Design a protein with these regions (language model features):
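Composition-driven recognition of glycine/serine/threonine/acidic- and proline-rich low-complexity segments
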Residues: 1-196
Length: 196
């Protein structure tokens, strides 16, 4: 499958859009070259490849839409932020961004067998590995304990509990640490896969 850059948009073969944003676009996923040509896509700051040519990191300024031939794997980003995207196995890896004045954090611990999409508030979307993503609203003064298996996203304060220091390369582990358990303190909204 080939991609072309046309007027700031990169589209896949057959005319279906792969990327669209208000700045020069670039090829996504395994289509990414190992070395980007000078003068082309100069805004592309860094290229992360923990999964060997499957992950990219882009600095966005504006709106963005992504999809593939069979199903969308990234939908609507309205605000500027740093987003990591890859094939349909991984939708979104965003350590932090601003969403309507609230802080939204998304930590996908695993991207194996990712087959469907869960859309969050404000146009954000993350991958649900097997359609098991749960949404919990935690009121002020309440606490939710989660032992995550794959995807964790939340608004509000950072969680407490046993939370190992996570680096970018660690976000894409085949499986999360066995001892990982997070406590979310309200008011907040939490999306997660696992037991809570």
């Amino acid at each position: 499958m080939e991609a072309q850059i046309e007027n700031g948009f990169a589209c896949v073969e057959g005319g279906e859009w792969l990327f669209g944003m208000r700045q020069p676009a670039a090829v996504c996923g395994s289509l990414a070259p190992k070395r980007l040509p000078r003068g082309e896509c100069g805004w592309w700051r860094r290229l992360f490849q923990p999964d060997r040519r499957r992950l990219q990191c882009a600095d966005l300024d504006g709106r963005m839409w992504c999809g593939d031939r069979t199903r969308p794997f990234l939908t609507r980003i309205d605000l500027a932020g740093r987003v990591a995207v890859a094939t349909e196995k991984l939708l979104l890896a965003q350590p932090s961004s601003r969403r309507l004045g609230a802080l939204l954090r998304v930590v996908p611990f695993s991207y194996r067998n990712a087959v469907c999409t869960t859309v969050l508030e404000g146009g954000w979307a993350v991958v649900s590995t097997q359609g098991r993503t749960q949404r919990a609203v935690v009121a002020d003064g309440e606490t939710l304990g989660v032992k995550p298996e794959a995807v964790v996203a939340w608004t509000g304060r950072p969680p407490t509990g046993h939370c190992p220091r996570i680096r970018l390369r660690d976000l894409f582990l085949p499986r999360p640490p066995k001892s990982l358990r997070l406590n979310f303190h309200g008011p907040c909204v939490v999306w997660f896969e696992g037991s809570g």
